[in-house]
């Protein structure tokens, strides 16, 4: 998959192991997200990528960040189509009233690259 870095803090997505389903996405810079009522906090992931034709990227919170810290995506799941060439962005929010701080290089989200059916309708 072709990846174009857009931020000096960019780190290429990686799999935690050969059996991991998703590629961990690294935050290019630090920040903090608070509880937002349906607004979310838009944060760029510091890169653009070419997902192969016939596939789609699904961005989801890493399990521990969602379960243990209440981190979620404002739009439930980020969908990156094969023809999208802009910067990958997440709209973050917290389920609870608390906040979550992160540092550059932290892994908050993951992307699953999955095949997509093309059907005549």
Regions found by a protein language model. Name each.
Residues 1-121:
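DUTPase catalytic domain/fold
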């Amino acid at each position: 998959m072709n990846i174009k870095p857009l931020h000096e803090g960019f780190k290429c997505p990686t799999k935690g192991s050969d059996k991991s389903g998703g590629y961990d996405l690294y935050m290019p810079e630090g920040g903090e997200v608070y509880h937002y009522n349906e607004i979310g906090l838009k944060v760029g992931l510091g890169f653009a990528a070419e997902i192969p034709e016939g596939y789609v990227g699904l961005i989801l919170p890493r399990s521990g960040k969602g379960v243990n810290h209440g981190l979620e995506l404002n739009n439930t799941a980020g969908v990156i189509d094969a023809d999208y060439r802009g910067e990958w962005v997440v709209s973050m929010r917290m389920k609870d009233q608390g906040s979550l701080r992160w540092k550059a290089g932290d892994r908050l989200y993951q992307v699953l690259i999955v095949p997509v059916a093309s059907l005549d309708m």
